[in-house]
């Protein structure tokens, strides 16, 4: 059994999708040890409780520095014998302490065809760009924002009559297929 921790900051829909794939047996030999969140009111907490997944709520402002925050996370991760970190809507850059402790073992999913539209509101950026395609990317995490080595991408059309909300749903659907597929191939 490979132990993974999932980090999320918001609604946690990708978190829940991964958990459901584990529970159904579609993702084999994986144990989700806990949800790590940096927001005490994040909806992902409710999703974790629904699936009886332990939750660690650690707000960076509780710590004197980013290094202290990350060292605390590393301690918790090591106590749970976590082997991989899966970012699922975690809205913080990963710093040197986590990167050093989990080198090559942190994955992220981003709602664009990287290297295009890094950072926040990637779907909105694609929607307003005039592009005719967008998609989702799973990549290894490095010290930059959405700059790690790309593992796999899936794409969808941006139709002239799509609303931003419709495009968000298309990309979310891609993510729900792509992330578990990549996790199954990579996390061993």
UniProtKB/Swiss-Prot annotation:
Annotated active site? 110
Q: Which residues bind N(1)-(5-phospho-beta-D-ribosyl)glycinamide per the record?
A: 12-14
Q: Which UniProt keywords apply?
A: Purine biosynthesis, Transferase
Query: What positions does the entry give for (6R)-10-formyltetrahydrofolate binding?
Result: 66, 91-94, 108
Documented EC number(s): 2.1.2.2
Mind listing the GO molecular function terms for this protein? phosphoribosylglycinamide formyltransferase activity
What's any GO biological process attached to this entry? 'de novo' IMP biosynthetic process
* Pathway the protein takes part in: Purine metabolism; IMP biosynthesis via de novo pathway; N(2)-formyl-N(1)-(5-phospho-D-ribosyl)glycinamide from N(1)-(5-phospho-D-ribosyl)glycinamide (10-formyl THF route): step 1/1
Q: Where is this site: Raises pKa of active site His?
A: 146
Q: What is any one of the record's Gene Ontology cellular component terms? A: cytosol
> Known catalysed reaction(s)?
N(1)-(5-phospho-beta-D-ribosyl)glycinamide + (6R)-10-formyltetrahydrofolate = N(2)-formyl-N(1)-(5-phospho-beta-D-ribosyl)glycinamide + (6S)-5,6,7,8-tetrahydrofolate + H(+)
Q: Does the keyword Metal-binding apply?
A: no
HAMAP family according to UniProt? PurN
Which protein family is it in? Belongs to the GART family.
Report the protein's function.
Catalyzes the transfer of a formyl group from 10-formyltetrahydrofolate to 5-phospho-ribosyl-glycinamide (GAR), producing 5-phospho-ribosyl-N-formylglycinamide (FGAR) and tetrahydrofolate.
Instruction: List the protein's name.
Output: Phosphoribosylglycinamide formyltransferase
UniProt source species: Staphylococcus aureus (strain MRSA252)
